[in-house]
């Protein structure tokens, strides 16, 4: 759908049990082979993400969304499913878009929206990077340290030896 509206190419990175389904899909749809690249495991993921306009994360389950953060750190907006902890990372309409799990049509429409609007894409690239910076260890570590200190202070004198 996306390629019909906006010149684009789908790049699939990584390996795993789903690759068999992808290969079967391409076997059954040979006209799509020229529009999809299967890179498998890569050593230069950050560089590939930097060169990408959009990162798709159609997870059915996701605890935190580290892959989304990696894409955002490379200035790449994320179009993801609304699964697990992803909405805490990917902010709807700011760093990318969220779609209901399995809603491929919504994800396609978000791709078209981003890829056909250079101004929106440029702003989301900036927002994505800013969001990733919030999760950088040097920004997160002091928050955790303060939480631990507060917890320890609150329990001082309240603990008894058994």
Short names for language-model regions:
Residues 65-68, 86:
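Short glycine/serine-rich donor-binding loops of glycosyltransferases
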Residues 106, 113, 120-134, 143-146, ...:
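A short, well-ordered alpha-helix in the C-terminal region of glycosyltransferases
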Residues 55-56:
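A short hydrophobic beta-strand element within the catalytic core of glycosyltransferases
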């Amino acid at each position: 759908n996306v390629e019909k509206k906006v010149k684009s190419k789908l790049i699939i990175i990584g390996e795993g049990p789903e690759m068999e389904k992808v290969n079967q899909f391409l076997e059954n749809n040979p006209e799509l082979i020229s529009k999809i690249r299967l890179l498998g495991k890569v050593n230069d993921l950050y560089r590939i993400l930097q060169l990408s306009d959009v990162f798709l994360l159609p997870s059915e389950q996701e605890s935190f969304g580290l892959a989304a953060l990696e894409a955002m750190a490379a200035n790449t907006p994320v179009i993801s499913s609304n699964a697990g902890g992803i909405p805490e990372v990917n902010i709807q309409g700011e760093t990318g878009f969220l779609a209901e799990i399995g809603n491929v049509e919504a994800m396609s429409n978000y791709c078209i929206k981003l890829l056909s609007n250079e101004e929106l894409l440029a702003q989301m690239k900036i927002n994505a990077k800013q969001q990733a910076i919030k999760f950088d260890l040097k920004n997160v570590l002091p928050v955790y340290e303060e939480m631990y200190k507060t917890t320890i202070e609150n329990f001082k004198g309240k603990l008894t030896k058994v």
